[in-house]
């Protein structure tokens, strides 16, 4: 086998191993770090929804 054949085989081996590495599930190092900020982002829409429900109840009285 000549050098070009070996290089082609090496290329495909590296390509396949790279795809296998990408298929592994990644561990989330900072799983709960952004949770507080995530919850804070939802407080405002919830407050708006509560205000809309209150105004709807007042309107229907």
UniProtKB/Swiss-Prot annotation:
Span of the signal peptide: 1-18
Keywords: Secreted, Signal
Tissue expression per record: Expressed by the venom gland.
Subcellular location: Secreted
GO cellular component: extracellular region
Lineage: superkingdom: Eukaryota
Main location group: secreted
Family designation: Belongs to the non-disulfide-bridged peptide (NDBP) superfamily. Long chain multifunctional peptide (group 2) family.
Protein known as: Venom protein 22.1
Source organism of the structure: Lychas mucronatus (Chinese swimming scorpion)
């Amino acid at each position: 086998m000549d050098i070009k054949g070996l290089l082609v085989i090496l290329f495909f081996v590296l390509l396949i191993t790279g795809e296998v590495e990408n298929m592994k599930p990644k561990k989330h190092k900072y799983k709960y770090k952004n949770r507080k900020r995530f919850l804070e982002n939802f407080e405002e829409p919830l407050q708006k929804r509560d205000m809309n429900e209150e105004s709807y109840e007042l309107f229907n009285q």
